[in-house]
UniProtKB/Swiss-Prot annotation:
Catalytic residues, chain numbering: C52 (cysteine sulfenic acid (-soh) intermediate)
Additional remark text: The active site is a conserved redox-active cysteine residue, the peroxidatic cysteine (C(P)), which makes the nucleophilic attack on the peroxide substrate. The peroxide oxidizes the C(P)-SH to cysteine sulfenic acid (C(P)-SOH), which then reacts with another cysteine residue, the resolving cysteine (C(R)), to form a disulfide bridge. The disulfide is subsequently reduced by an appropriate electron donor to complete the catalytic cycle. In this typical 2-Cys peroxiredoxin, C(R) is provided by the other dimeric subunit to form an intersubunit disulfide.
Top-level lineage group: Eukaryota
Enzyme Commission numbers on file: 1.11.1.24
Coiled-coil features, chain-numbered ranges: none
PROSITE patterns: THIOREDOXIN_2
Thioredoxin domain: residues covered: 6-165
Family: Belongs to the peroxiredoxin family. AhpC/Prx1 subfamily.
Name of the protein in question: Peroxiredoxin-1
Lineage: Eukaryota, Metazoa, Chordata, Craniata, Vertebrata
Function (record text): Thiol-specific peroxidase that catalyzes the reduction of hydrogen peroxide and organic hydroperoxides to water and alcohols, respectively. Plays a role in cell protection against oxidative stress by detoxifying peroxides and as sensor of hydrogen peroxide-mediated signaling events. Might participate in the signaling cascades of growth factors and tumor necrosis factor-alpha by regulating the intracellular concentrations of H(2)O(2). Reduces an intramolecular disulfide bond in GDPD5 that gates the ability to GDPD5 to drive postmitotic motor neuron differentiation.
Subunit text: Homodimer; disulfide-linked, upon oxidation. 5 homodimers assemble to form a ring-like decamer. Interacts with GDPD5; forms a mixed-disulfide with GDPD5. Interacts with SESN1 and SESN2. Interacts with FAM107A.
Pfam families in the cross-refs: 1-cysPrx_C (PF10417), AhpC-TSA (PF00578)
Compartment(s) where it occurs, according to its Swiss-Prot or TrEMBL record: Cytoplasm
Length: 199
């Protein structure tokens, strides 16, 4: 795995690449195009594989839930944009993606994967890296899975909501926090309000 330039609390590495957009068109996009919004950037190993379509379809199907909280979801792999489009145009029953509601970025030169530190160099593919970037472009969360295990859309959505809550209210979110549940005031005395209710 490459070391990369992606660090929690620092600006996420910007990139420019060709993506297949939800309307099926090719477009050059940059991460900086999304400033002012949260971004979930997730990498997957390859098109036309087995775990990947389950993740991509799950994120695409729930993309509106992310948009409602000012967050965009972007998928990326080392495949060409032509390969992405062919996969999108392949029926789901044949292992394809079908219609997409999120852009899929092409990283054929592996520049983005290297910059984000998730390139599996011996195979030239990406690990399952997932990055949550806030509305100022700061990297807030990194998860990297080995190839055989997919990621949870529910957990990703929860994490975005938690970071947005802490940004807005200045309180912190305990383990397993869900929107609407109790948070903790980051103060020795005031935190006791939370702990006295949760033994």
């Amino acid at each position: 795995m490459s070391s990369g330039n992606a660090y929690i609390g620092k600006l996420a590495p910007d990139f420019q690449a060709t993506a297949v957009m939800p309307d099926g068109q090719f477009k050059e996009i940059k991460l900086s195009d999304y400033k002012g919004k949260y971004v979930v950037l997730f990498f997957y190993p390859l098109d036309f594989t087995f775990v990947c379509p389950t993740e991509i379809i799950a994120f695409s199907d729930r993309s509106e839930e992310f948009r409602k909280i000012n967050c965009e979801v972007i998928g990326a792999s080392v495949d060409s944009h032509f390969c992405h489009l062919a996969w999108i145009n392949t029926p789901k029953k044949q292992g394809g993606l079908g219609s997409m509601h999120i852009p899929l970025v092409s990283d054929t030169k592996r520049v983005i994967a290297k910059d984000y530190g998730i390139l599996k160099e011996d195979e030239g593919i990406s690990y399952r890296g997932l990055f949550i970037i806030d509305d100022k472009g700061t990297l807030r969360q990194i998860t990297i899975n080995d190839l055989p295990v997919g990621r949870s859309v529910d957990e990703t959505l929860r994490l975005v909501q938690a970071f947005q809550f802490t940004d807005k209210h200045g309180e912190v979110c305990p383990a397993g926090w869900q929107p609407g549940s109790d948070t903790i005031k980051p103060d020795v005395q005031k935190s006791k309000e939370y702990f006295s209710k949760h033994k």
